[in-house]
A protein has these predicted regions:
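Extracellular glycoside hydrolase catalytic/binding regions
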Residues: 591-631
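Extracellular glycan-recognition regions
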Residues: 1-103
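Surface beta-strand/loop "capping" patches
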Residues: 349-378
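Active-site-adjacent substrate/metal-binding segments within catalytic domains
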Residues: 174-228, 232-240, 245-252, 258, ...
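Beta-strand-rich interaction surfaces with strong enrichment in secreted/lumenal proteins
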Residues: 16-22, 66-67, 210-214, 224, ...
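Accessory beta-strand-rich segments of carbohydrate-active enzymes
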Residues: 47, 53, 72, 121, ...
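Extended acidic/polar, glycine-enriched regions
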Residues: 273-279, 372-464
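Extended carbohydrate-recognition surfaces in non-catalytic/accessory domains of CAZymes
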Residues: 1-5, 91-240, 320-343
């Protein structure tokens, strides 16, 4: 609803979902009631209006004529009638709008059907030396307002037939992020619709259709039953949660295995001593709000956007809102306190001697490898390390050979081995030819027994800065790209990732940045495959922007550790060209306090030193920015 007004007083009044898709060729009846400062919009024969609001500026437009027309599509209007209303016609009529919501009985029936169709995760047999089982899919779910008892929530004895079903990975809240979640003013208050009616309604409907009231949930319990075969006894079993927002407590068969604070960090849980053959229960408590705060996240995105263009003269305004802006964990541009197990979950089963981590440092004719190995067992173990490099497209073997002979690891010992393979002739990775290889790292014991085999997909390419210019594979380039792409709207939609990146390629865009929020494995893998170069940004946009105070040291540590963890997680992706610390920090010439600006520099400098230690192969950009004030 938009109301025209005198001398520039036109106003956007509100937007509401129809609840159905209009059909071309059909007629729809619309009734508009205007009585004093009240406006009500009815559709067809519904008894309640779709829009019912008070126009605070009605006195500016006390009278006028009626006109028909407008719209973006060809529309026919007919049978217009105008009927006078008494001045007090709506005096005793409460403001109430039509809402199409499921009744409690309908929701309970749906919950029972979904619960009846739930099946536990099951691994029938181990597959080779390393077995990965995805735990994505339906999990049991119980909000805090229905269960506020930890012992009952985590117990394997608890009857969970009355639990809800929640998909993983997913948020249990609607995604409200920057351009798709910003508020628009209206007489009834701010409306966080953003630029897309369709997306806003899609996310709202997703959460309204849950069998619980997502608005009431402060924290929730997730449960997943998992059946394992008999021969997992004595194996190393690692649970990996790519990301949980925002606080996670993970229990295995009733025992607390680990806890984690942060929205983007990977959580690895050694479940070797807690998981067993047969039936197991994984329980996760996910908390939406820190310390009971109900308003900080809700206000943060609005303040971010309103303050990001503020100049240093408005220092006081920024500091007044420091609690709403800074005293919460990094969440990118996400607003409205997103919560849930929102990135994939898997269980990895290996021998106690395993490859823990691999860092591939490519050149144009080979690579240097940092391979971290660990013996989780109770006895010393000897083995050989082999490396295979296989073209992912053709299956051709580029290299296969023994890399290190007779390695010895004592019980519970972890060690990193470094070696180089050279004189290869690989197909290089470029945006035009995104050639990828599977790098296999095999641990082989006596008599050829394979203890572990980790496969990492990567590519051969170099990216560096020399004399102020960028060089990809030794060739000089000007760097120009476009952003941002819709990762944050659908972080687990692989089809969207591939489709959008192909559209970018069709539009001659080969480079972008992970603006608004860091990407996950699905989108980074899509960038590798589609040939999209990436500037990977940090998790805290506008950190210490302008003249804002320095955040609490605990928050700085959360940001630092989480971001450095992402470097280790994604440093093998060839599409990742360089790291960017954050988006628009801009304190370097916009902080009115020079000593505070120097301290901010020291904080960032310490993090950058760690970034260079974790990944010495890539350039680092201070922040994503544009022309500085007055420069």
């Amino acid at each position: 609803l938009r109301r025209t007004g005198y001398m520039g007083t036109d106003e956007f009044m509100g937007v509401r979902p129809l609840g159905f898709h209009p059909v071309p060729g059909e007629w729809y009846r619309v009734k508009v009631e205007v009585c004093g400062n009240r406006i009500r919009i009815f559709l067809n024969d519904e008894k309640q209006p779709h829009i019912d609001l008070v126009d605070k500026n009605a006195d500016l437009v006390p009278s006028g004529e009626v006109a028909l027309g407008g719209g973006w599509i060809e529309t026919e209007f007919d049978d217009l009638t105008v009927t006078p209303m008494a001045d007090d016609a709506l005096k005793n009529v409460k403001v109430a709008e039509y809402q199409k919501k499921a009744t409690p009985t309908e929701k309970e029936n749906k919950r029972r059907q979904e619960r009846a169709s739930y099946t536990s995760a099951k691994l029938a047999a181990l597959t080779g030396s390393r077995t990965d089982i995805t735990l994505d899919g339906n999990w049991l779910f119980m909000p805090d307002y229905q269960l506020d008892n930890k012992d009952k929530a985590v117990s394997v004895q608890t009857n969970d037939q009355d639990w809800h079903i929640m998909s993983v990975p997913n948020f249990w809240t609607p995604i409200r992020i920057w351009l798709h979640g910003e508020t628009m003013p209206s007489p009834t208050g701010a409306q966080p619709k953003g630029v897309s009616d369709t997306y806003y309604q899609q996310e709202t409907d997703r959460c309204e259709n849950y069998t619980f009231d997502y608005r009431r949930v402060k924290y929730a319990w997730y449960r997943q039953w998992l059946e394992l075969p008999a021969n997992v006894e004595g194996k190393n079993m690692t649970l990996t949660f790519d990301a949980v927002s925002k606080i996670a407590e993970i229990y295995i068969n009733g025992t607390l295995a680990t806890s984690h604070l942060g929205m983007f960090g990977e959580i690895q849980v050694d479940g070797s001593r807690l998981l067993k053959p047969g039936k197991n229960l994984i329980t996760v408590k996910v908390t939406r709000k820190m310390d009971g705060s109900a308003s900080e996240s809700a206000n943060a995105i609005d303040f971010f956007y309103s303050s990001v263009r503020e100049s240093e003269q408005e220092d006081a305004k920024v500091e007044v809102n420091k609690d709403a802006l800074l005293k919460e964990i990094p969440h990118g541009f996400y607003g409205d306190e997103p919560a849930g197990i929102w990135q994939p979950v898997k269980l990895t089963i290996t021998d106690p001697v395993k490859v823990e981590d691999v860092f591939i440092k490519p050149t144009l004719n080979g690579a240097t490898f940092d391979v971290t190995l660990k013996n989780h067992g109770s006895k010393k173990k000897q083995f050989d390390l082999y490396t295979d490099i296989i073209d992912k497209e053709t299956g051709a073997v580029l290299y296969s050979g023994l890399s290190i002979r007779k390695l010895n690891l004592n019980a519970d010992e972890e060690r990193m081995e470094t070696y180089t393979i050279s004189d290869l002739k690989p197909r290089l990775w470029t945006p035009q030819h995104p050639n990828l290889y599977d790098f296999k790292f095999r641990l082989v014991a006596d008599k050829g027994t394979e203890l572990d085999c980790l496969t990492e997909t990567s590519g051969f390419r170099t990216f560096e800065v020399k004399d102020g210019l960028f060089y990809l594979n030794g060739n000089k380039y000007w760097l120009r790209g476009g952003n941002h792409i819709p990762f944050a709207l659908a972080p687990n939609d692989e089809n969207l990732a591939n489709t959008f990146m192909q559209l970018m390629k069709a539009g001659n865009i080969d480079v972008t940045r992970t603006h608004t929020t860091p990407w996950n494995k699905r989108w980074m893998t899509a960038a590798d495959r589609n040939g999209i170069g990436v500037s990977f940004e940090g998790t805290w946009s506008w950190l210490m922007i302008h003249s804002t105070p320095i955040p609490d040291q605990r928050l700085i540590e959360i940001w630092r550790n989480e971001f450095l963890g992402l470097l280790k997680k994604y440093r093998n992706h060839p599409s990742l060209l360089f790291w960017t610390v954050n988006n628009e920090m801009k304190f370097y010439d916009n902080d009115s306090n020079l000593e505070r600006a120097k301290e901010k520099y020291r904080i960032i400098s310490d993090v950058v030193k760690e970034m260079r230690r974790i990944d010495p192969t890539r350039p680092i950009c201070f922040d994503s920015n544009y022309q500085a004030t007055g420069k």
